[in-house]
C-alpha cells in the first residue's frame, strides 16, 4: 500500500463520482 497508489485511486473515485453527478444532473434524473 503506497501513498501514491492510494492517492490515485481516491482521485479516480472522486472524479468518476463527480462526473456521474454532472451527467445525471444534465439528464434531469
Swiss-Prot record:
Can you list the disulfide-bonded cysteine pairs? none
* Pfam families for this protein: PetN (PF03742)
Q: Does the keyword Transmembrane helix apply?
A: yes
- What membrane topology does the annotation report for this chain? Single-pass membrane protein
Question: Which parts pass through the membrane?
Answer: 3-23
| Gene Ontology BP terms | cytochrome complex assembly; photosynthesis
Keywords noted in UniProt: Chloroplast, Electron transport, Membrane, Photosynthesis, Plastid, Thylakoid, Transmembrane, Transmembrane helix, Transport
Would you say which domain of life the source belongs to?
A: Eukaryota
Q: What does this protein do?
A: Component of the cytochrome b6-f complex, which mediates electron transfer between photosystem II (PSII) and photosystem I (PSI), cyclic electron flow around PSI, and state transitions.
Q: What HAMAP family has UniProt attached to this entry?
A: Cytb6_f_PetN
Subunit composition and interactions: The 4 large subunits of the cytochrome b6-f complex are cytochrome b6, subunit IV (17 kDa polypeptide, PetD), cytochrome f and the Rieske protein, while the 4 small subunits are PetG, PetL, PetM and PetN. The complex functions as a dimer.
Could you say which protein family the record assigns here?
Belongs to the PetN family.
What is this protein's record name? Cytochrome b6-f complex subunit 8
Give the originating organism.
Pinus thunbergii
Taxon lineage:
Eukaryota, Viridiplantae, Streptophyta, Embryophyta, Tracheophyta
* Gene assigned in the entry: petN
Amino acid at each position: 500500500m503506497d501513498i501514491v497508489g492510494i492517492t490515485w485511486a481516491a482521485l479516480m473515485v472522486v472524479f468518476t463520482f463527480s462526473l456521474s453527478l454532472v451527467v445525471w444532473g444534465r439528464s434531469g434524473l
